Amino acid sequence: MRGRRLSGPMFDAIAPIRMQRSRGAASVRLGPRGIEDLAQSGSAKAMLPRMTAGRPEIVFLNTAGGLASGDRLDYRIELAPRTQALATTQTAERAYRAKDAPAQIRLHLQVGEGGWLDWLPQETILYDGARLGRETAVDLAPGAGCLLLEPIILGRLAMGETIRHLQLTDRRIVRQDGRMIHHDALALDDAALSRLHHPAMLGKARAMASLALIAPHAADLLEPARAVLDEPGVTGAASAPPGRLILRLLADDGWPLRRQVIRLLRVLRPDPLPRIWQV
Amino acid sequence: MTTITPEAARLRLAQYLSPAFPTGGFAWSQGLEWAMDQGAVTRATLPQWLEDWLDHGAGWCDAVLLSLALRRGADHAELDDLARAMCPCARRLAETVEQGTAFAANVAALTGRPQSAAALPVAVGRACGCLPLPAGEIIGLYLQAQAAALISAAVRFLPLGPVEGQAMLAGLQPALLAAAARAGTADPKDLASATWGADLAAMRHETMVTRIFRS
């Protein structure tokens, strides 16, 4: 039995009362002709809405309605050679106050030769006292590529929440043919929080997102991406080290951030946006 | 290889990490130039920028990479991949690889042992791993050299006198020592940062029309 709780805007500010730790694991394998394997357990679900056009879509959902101390969530995607897919999450992921062990999220995304994965999850919202460790491991076969988004919101500005305690480690590692080609790790703790307003850190921003596009043509998208980095309320920049396009966005709040992300996604990917990312 | 006394090792280390050692360090600012140009970093706030760089930014990550590269049995090719993979922008990548490659070429010329191109902290760790000195001492001196290079960039850009810059460096020394000690026992999981403002500065530096520095 797992502790389920209500979620939704009404309950966002209420600390959950959870007697048990939740566990969830969902795993999807897709081939060129569609789904080859689907396994899910505990609070994790994977849905594959029927698509009429564009790439197949995978939608993950954590039915526990958020993450608290000791919770663990595993998502896994395996794309066969020459398979393209888009994966996202049904709702924002909420990390609540954790007194003891941090909540853990593990993502393992494998893309076969010549394949492509768009990993476009919705926001991770961190509440005061949240402790979260997230590891995203991406394994690309030769000729495979991916687009990785990670939006993070510190508290809910609209609710006047400020964060006093936090422990976040959010690490993304991309390997191609076994060799590490991208490593992006964010660590926020109480020591960092006390300096968060400094210009070298987050300045006044309380919402942030990183985008990384890993592909041989990444550099071709640098100028088109820079051209749309003008959303009011967002400070963003882009750069293209060989084989990668990397963007960092800092925003006052989640809404301008979302608007900027949508405008960037329209430039960076040929297909229509997933329903969840449409406004 | 021949043995070297700690006293001789200290001289060698000071030589390698001196601004006179030809790695071209004077040409780079890690995005600091953009931040100064925008007024986000001033004479008054430079020490704060440096502390964030040291405790939560590229300074810290370099210190951990150096620590890993100093260890016996370190896989330097793999660490070099990691160091490059960690660079979030093109100029930061060029900065660490061009300096590291020059450093390795200098060391090869001095020691007669070939050294392949590598990111700076990996090249320094590979060259200094055999020195009979505590890791914390090597990391501390490396961080001080990097901080001094940033301050030197600020002295050239801001209204900031060279002696005032040296006073800032002296003020940073306790934090440099603390970071070096922490990095000495760190593991790859400690490679993480929170200095997105500095990352944005380094990215935006790429589009500056008039600039003194290459990053």
From Swiss-Prot, chain A:
GO (cellular component) term, any one: cytoplasm
Pfam families (alphabetical): UreD (PF01774)
Highest taxon, organism lineage: Bacteria
Keyword Transferase in record: no
Subcellular localization: Cytoplasm
MF annotations from Gene Ontology: nickel cation binding
Alphabetically ordered keywords of this record: Chaperone, Cytoplasm, Nickel insertion
Protein family (similarity comment): Belongs to the UreD family.
Subunit structure, as described in the record: UreD, UreF and UreG form a complex that acts as a GTP-hydrolysis-dependent molecular chaperone, activating the urease apoprotein by helping to assemble the nickel containing metallocenter of UreC. The UreE protein probably delivers the nickel.
Function: Required for maturation of urease via the functional incorporation of the urease nickel metallocenter.
Annotated protein name in UniProt: Urease accessory protein UreD
Organism: Paracoccus denitrificans (strain Pd 1222)
Organism classification: Bacteria, Pseudomonadati, Pseudomonadota, Alphaproteobacteria, Rhodobacterales
Name of the encoding gene: ureD
Curated annotation (Swiss-Prot), chain B:
Membrane spanning residue stretches: none
Keyword Cytoplasm part of the UniProt annotation: yes
InterPro entries: UreF (IPR002639), UreF_sf (IPR038277)
Any GO CC annotation of this UniProt entry: cytoplasm
Pfam families reported in the protein's UniProt record: UreF
A GO term, aspect molecular function: nickel cation binding
Domain of life: Bacteria
Entry keyword set: Chaperone, Cytoplasm, Nickel insertion
Compartment list: Cytoplasm
Family named by the database record: Belongs to the UreF family.
Subunit relationships: UreD, UreF and UreG form a complex that acts as a GTP-hydrolysis-dependent molecular chaperone, activating the urease apoprotein by helping to assemble the nickel containing metallocenter of UreC. The UreE protein probably delivers the nickel.
Function according to Swiss-Prot or TrEMBL: Required for maturation of urease via the functional incorporation of the urease nickel metallocenter.
PANTHER family for the chain: UREASE ACCESSORY PROTEIN F
Name of the protein in question: Urease accessory protein UreF
Gene expressing this chain: ureF
